[in-house]
Amino acid sequence: SYRKLSRGMKSIVSNIIGICSNASITIFDEPTIGLDADNRNEFYKILLDSYIKNPRTIILSTHLINEVENLIENVVIIHKGKVIVDDSIDNISQKSFYISGDKSDLEKLKCLKNTTPDKSFGSKQVYKYYGDINEDDLKFIESLNINLETMNLQDMFVHLTKRGNKNE
């Protein structure tokens, strides 16, 4: 009986029902709980194949953000009952950065005024930043030895929920 199944097997049964329903809106709430890495990968592969054959809205809630980052088109982040991000993955990747360089250079960036460094190594600092970067800051970044790298979705999520979305 269903009640005697392990948590992972219950997840598989629920996922099969969700995928096979082909409903116009399909909701998966933590669909990989109890699944090992191989079964999680298999679920994502089957989900993507199903979506390609039958495009529809799939809502997926997960704490394993790094596993779904390449599968999603839109992201909604809810923190303390409020939506703090609702945007396409493309737009989010254009606003999520690691900014690193010499402390004296980074202090001149307007976009970092109300933030604190994520890491410091002597005179070097690394910031996590989510938001738009103005033209003056971009020109300044290009003229100095400041590194600008795209932040992954998981780090962006942690940054925004940990810091209360202060710098947006």
Where is each model-derived feature located?
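Short, surface-exposed beta-strand/loop "edge" segments at domain boundaries and coil↔beta transitions
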Residues: T26-I27, P31, D105-L109, I133-L138
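ABC transporter nucleotide-binding domains
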Residues: S1-N66, N70-E73, H79
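Residues that scaffold the ATP/ADP-binding catalytic core of kinase and kinase-like folds
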Residues: G18, K108-L109, M156, L160
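Generic structural signal for individual residues within well-ordered alpha-helical segments
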Residues: N41, S93, Q154-F157
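Functionally constrained cores in energy, signaling, and assembly domains
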Residues: Y2, V13-G18, T26-I27, S50, ...
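C-terminal coupling/interaction segments
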Residues: F121-E168
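ABC transporter nucleotide-binding domain
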Residues: Y44-G131
